[in-house]
Amino acid sequence: MDYFKTSIDQLHEQLRSGKVTSSQLVDETLAGINQLDAEVDAFLALNADGAKEKAAAVDAAGIADDQPLAGVPIAIKDNIVTKGVVTTAASKILANFNPIYDATVIQKLDAAGAINVGKTNMDEFAMGSSTENSAFKTTKNAWDHTRVPGGSSGGSAAAVAAGEVIAALGSDTGGSIRQPAAFNGIVGVKPTYGRVSRWGLIAFSSSLDQIGTLTRHVKDAAQLLNVIAGHDERDSTTADTPVPDFTAKIGQDIKGMKIALPKEYLGKGVDPAVADKIKAAAKQFEDMGATVTEVSLPHTQYAVPSYYIIASSEASSNLQRFDGIRYGFRAKDVKNIEDVYVRSRSEGFGPEVKRRIMLGTFSLSAGFYDAYFKKAGQVRTLITRDFEDVFKDYDLIIGPTTPTVAFKIGEKVTDPVTMYMNDILTIPVNLAGLPAASVPAGFVDGMPVGLQLIGKHFDESTIFQVAAAFEAQNDYLAQIPGGK
């Protein structure tokens, strides 16, 4: 199956008409992954037997008109638990962890007839911006195999961009869906915090994590979000609010819409060539009848330090459960119980995870709590208020997803602060709990540029409306990555 020339709607029609069966589609997809992934390294594990069994069941039951995902193979980021399929979070400490239940999003996909074909690579415990922190392999950018795919959902993004699957799930804590989507020239959507259940998502930072989508087409993302969104009694952070049809506003014009462009998002540190692509996108929106006005989000500069204190502090707490006792990796030849804890965690966690655990533990300690964690929370409030002030007068905020295009593998891995700053434009959205998407906005030196669209709380529909209008005006998807 040529996923470069196919949307979920087109795939649904082929499956409904009998032009292709789900079993054939799964076989073709698995064969394509086995061929392409030798270079891309997007997958950690394939669910071949489970996918074939599910496909046969879908073929036997038939596909209804209102089941656009039925029979469609989808990849899953490896921090979303899947019953019977090893789930590692790309960490040695969970190398052989076989979950006994499915995450809520997996249950919803299964009920919709979608097929999990495999688990994708990521930065260990979703901590990273390049997928170089995986304990198992380094995923390559679909456009240039010497460059990173972004992170932490780099495997999911590369798999979609390389044409291995039509769609994938990822998670976004500080940009982990949008940044790899931008680096690989695809659509990445982070829903509003609380829109999608986190039950079954291996926790990194509980107040920031959110499951979202990676696809080539805007409507595909909306259809996927239609299935996975909604309140879940097992996750108290999910919002008990109605879930609209996210495809409803796709195709509507954007005439009269008021769009904000923060001056901080085109300032120091942003590649001028990337900034030019965003300015060109703003001009396109104006040509479509919208107004684009420069605004200010003055506390953007404090987002990265605030985020790394909050996220690391929550990670320090969340990762206490990985102790070598209940499940996961356990060190051998230990002398006593303390040795089990110390050696299992020392040998099981990678350097970036240990760095963040130590930072978080320090920030939460009695002598530094007020100076660091409490202060970071206050900055988070200021960043949220910045967005609230802008959204009093505007429908949407736009800007670059990342300051630069994808960087070379190994280029930033020894300089964590430089790596962290790559997420400066995506992190504020997570701190404020807002929905946002990255859509293709052109190329710089042959590498994709992402346009970030930020919406009001629980207004993903406007993001999809504007993203689809922008997509329809451009032919960026006509260019296909070939790797190098």
From Swiss-Prot:
Keywords: ATP-binding, Ligase, Nucleotide-binding, Protein biosynthesis. Its EC number is 6.3.5.7. It comes from the Bacteria. Allows the formation of correctly charged Gln-tRNA(Gln) through the transamidation of misacylated Glu-tRNA(Gln) in organisms which lack glutaminyl-tRNA synthetase. The reaction takes place in the presence of glutamine and ATP through an activated gamma-phospho-Glu-tRNA(Gln). Belongs to the amidase family. GatA subfamily. NCBIfam families: gatA (TIGR00132). InterPro entries: Amidase, Amidase_CS, Amidase_dom, AS_sf, GatA. GO terms for biological process: translation. Heterotrimer of A, B and C subunits. This is Glutamyl-tRNA(Gln) amidotransferase subunit A. It comes from Lacticaseibacillus paracasei (strain ATCC 334 / BCRC 17002 / CCUG 31169 / CIP 107868 / KCTC 3260 / NRRL B-441) (Lactobacillus paracasei). Gene3D superfamilies: Amidase signature (AS) domain. GO terms for cellular component: glutamyl-tRNA(Gln) amidotransferase complex. PANTHER family: GLUTAMYL-TRNA(GLN) AMIDOTRANSFERASE SUBUNIT A (PTHR11895:SF151), TRANSAMIDASE (PTHR11895).
